[in-house]
Amino acid sequence: MKKYSSLVVILLLFFNTIVKADDIRDFEIEGMSIGDSLLDFFSEQTIKKNTKDYYGYKKDFSFIAIEIENHKSLKKYYGVQLHVKKNDKNYILYGINGYNYCKIDINNCYKQTEEIEKDFLRIFKKFDVRRANFKHSADPSKKSNVKATYFDFDNGDMISINVYDWGKKIGYTDNFDISIDANEFVKAFKNK
């Protein structure tokens, strides 16, 4: 009987891990997860000071971006871009993006993102993977390239890993980012 109860405990732990591994809310960027309140991480003054109108061109778009760079609480990423609903006084997170610059060698960015992708493939179980290489639409010279990997979950949530190899004329620094986005933000972004 003791053997069976041990087996049941092991099986329960195993299946619980699988279930957790397919919920992006269990994944963190700089300690933040989808569904968390930004107020648990930053003061309201910092949030308001760093609110950006990146989506003003999207009619009736219900989300705003907060971009925080080089903050003392950021340990792994140079900056984070956070998405919350407009007028939400609790600043509940629907999208989290962490990014770093590749100032010396973009190949380091490619290596880092390949390792992160391998980790995601080990951690998460139920998703479709899409990969794409394309020219960035912000660069009129068409010399800026993006290498992207998307993890699309059955419930509409998405994780993306991107490397931006910017053309010299646009003047941006090469960078990579990792985004975790809840279904509601993904749908709103695609539909507007």
Short names for language-model regions:
Residues M1, V9, K89-N90:
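Short hydrophobic/aromatic-rich motifs at helix boundaries and adjacent loops
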Residues K2-S5, F41:
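Asparagine-rich low-complexity intrinsically disordered tracts
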Residues Y4-F15:
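Sec-dependent N-terminal signal peptides
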Residues L12, H71-S73, N87-K89, P140-K142, ...:
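Sterically constrained small-residue positions within well-ordered secondary structures
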Residues A21-A65, G95-K192:
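Non-cytosolic coordination micro-motifs
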Residues E67-I92:
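Compositionally biased P/S/T/G-rich terminal and signal peptide-adjacent segments
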